[in-house]
């Protein structure tokens, strides 16, 4: 699924214990959806902050989205996060409701290079217009990475 062990994954405790036991820890990876999404987003490639999964509760999720947007305004960092595939549509809806119209938002789905791969970066107001025209993506049950950056 283009994920990496430990990044938004429960493996960190196991890796830390291996270090404590003095065992050799050898990272092996394939393609990373986070890095591929960041590369394809067109957003700041020098600085990023990864937030893992956002809160499930809508009010908490909106608060964190606004905090990430404010952080991006201050630091010019690209803000990156993921979501459980069955909550993607709700997350996108929250983002479009609470983020500033000029904020850049990238949605990168099924980043494997296959026929279902879909990556798009637009300003929030352009996302809203596309959704109103029925041109928005269906993200339900699709693995996605989300990125934002303030201009």
Give names to the regions the model predicted.
Residues 1-10:
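Conserved Motif II region of HX4D acyltransferases
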Residues 11, 74-151:
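A contiguous loop/helix-start segment that scaffolds small-molecule binding in enzyme catalytic cores
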Residues 3-4, 32-34, 55-58, 86-88, ...:
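Short, catalytically relevant binding-site loops at active-site mouths
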Residues 9-71:
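Class I SAM-dependent methyltransferase SAM-binding "motif I" and its flanking Rossmann-like core
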Residues 1, 51-52, 82-83:
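Thr-Gly-centered strand-to-loop micro-motif
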